[in-house]
Amino acid sequence: MNRDTPFTLVLGGGGMKGLAHIGVIQALVERGHRPTRIIGSSVGALVGAAWAGGMGIARLREIALGLRRKDVFAVAHADMAFKRMRSPALFKREPLEHLIARTVGDLTFQQLDPPVVVNTVDLNSGMQVCWGLPGLDDIRVADAVFASCALPGYFPPHEIGGRFYVDGAVVSNVPFDAARALGPELIVAVDVSASSVLTADAQDEGFAGVFARATEILMETLLEQRVRTWTTPAVYYIQPRVEHVTMFSFDHLREEVEEGYRATNAALERSDEWPEPGDVGIHPKRRVLVRVERERCIGCGNCLVHGPQGMFVLDSERKAVVTQPDQEWSPMDGGYIRHCPTYAIIARPADQKREMMKSG
């Protein structure tokens, strides 16, 4: 990507893992890449709005690395004790409100440079509402950001103009689909949600941890469905390696920021992988070889349901067979692999396979 290439930066949600976005912005700015606009969901909206509102990277890092659990997540003990199932949320709203006030203040959307769009959902209608778009920019940025961070069950819905809004991740956790209405320029999307096929021991984290993991699975599945047929504008997808961190963990704050910085610098170094003018779809694209380990296959047919049409068939022994082993994948392809209950589907980079054959 050239320095003069216009692009929209999309920052997805992911709880504390979203601190990686600070490193992402730092890497882009250091290399002279300034987005023409930012679209954010949840923590992505918070980081994007704070930076666009004039807060420097150094100050953002300082706040992020100094965060403690009580600064964001304070259990609403009184509501849980007295209101029980009618409690509005697990956590109090005040700590999050204070954090947003520290980073965003009383800014209006007109004061943000570059412009920022904040992804939310109307709780009662289910409609995606992107604050900051024309006609939706007459509220405080802090109100939009709180609503975007209000993951249902964890934080109470936020009232704006008599209606109640929650985290936009309910509909689109990495909302680059919202960029489609803003023009044909390149989209750089950053996904910090769980991307590991296996996430260990989620069942041991209590009901909040179990619900958080279930939410991650839901958001990832929704995202895959929304982008399966994506064409334009072209998207370059960056996935910092933070899948081992839970949404509510405060044990890896520095690592998350640094990983966002590393992943973005690494992506910018691979200039040959970035889409050219006129390209479509999601990038980077890489050749992979897909195979099925027959001894593991139980013939359940899940791969026929979740894989691309015609890619798998069952042979006479009800073993899955790959009809098109050589695939071109974007980061959003291959999700069907995790739907194999015996983990019999294997994908390897095509160049890795060729090197193994040469060395053998």
Annotate each PLM feature:
Residues N302-R318, G335-Q352:
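Iron-sulfur cluster-binding cysteine motifs and their immediate structural context
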Residues A320-G334:
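Short linker/helix segments within small regulatory modules
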Residues E295-R296, H339:
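Short pre-active-site segment immediately N-terminal to redox-active cysteine/selenocysteine motifs
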Residues M1-I38:
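Helix-rich "cap/lid" substructures immediately adjacent to catalytic or cofactor-binding pockets
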Residues V104-V117:
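A short alpha-helix-loop-beta-strand transition element characteristic
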Residues G14, V24, G44, V118, ...:
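Conserved small-residue
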Residues N2-F7, I57-T103, V121-V141, I160-Y165, ...:
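Non-catalytic peripheral regions of patatin-like phospholipases
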Residues P35-G53:
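Catalytic nucleophile loop
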